[in-house]
From Swiss-Prot:
It is found in: Nucleus, Nucleoplasm; Cytoplasm, P-body. It comes from the Eukaryota. This is Transcription and mRNA export factor SUS1. It holds the Pfam family EnY2. The gene is SUS1. Its main location: nucleus. Keywords: Activator, Chromatin regulator, Cytoplasm, Isopeptide bond, mRNA transport, Nucleus, Protein transport, Transcription, Transcription regulation, Translocation, Transport, Ubl conjugation. InterPro entries: TF_ENY2 (IPR018783), TF_EnY2_sf (IPR038212). It comes from Saccharomyces cerevisiae (strain YJM789) (Baker's yeast). Belongs to the ENY2 family. GO terms for cellular component: DUBm complex; nuclear pore; nucleoplasm; P-body; SAGA complex; transcription export complex 2.
Length: 96
């Protein structure tokens, strides 16, 4: 019997939260983003977008700012967090 993707995702998320790993990974990501000035850069991007388009529609602003925000995450932060996630998954998912 195979598990569908949604069920697997749900179980992984549940285990992440229950094990405390979600909080650890989340805290590490927040600290790194704050330290490298990412939060301030995203705030500036958002303000700029609001001024340019005179739009206060959250969905429109998000659709413009989100790709740029993801793009400016440093490689070292991205690699560190992805490594933590991979290590967590290797510990709970049978990959053989």
């Amino acid at each position: 019997m195979t598990m569908d993707t949604a069920q697997l995702k749900s179980q992984i998320q549940q285990y992440l939260v229950e094990s405390g790993n979600y909080e650890l990974i989340s805290n590490e990501l927040k600290a790194r983003l704050l330290q490298e000035g990412w939060v301030d850069k995203v705030k500036d991007l958002t303000k700029s977008e609001m001024n340019i388009n005179e739009s206060t529609n959250f969905t429109q602003i998000l659709s413009t700012v989100e790709p740029k925000a993801l793009e400016i995450v440093s490689d070292s932060t991205r690699e560190t967090v992805l490594k933590q996630i991979r290590e967590f998954l290797e510990g709970i998912v049978d990959t053989q």
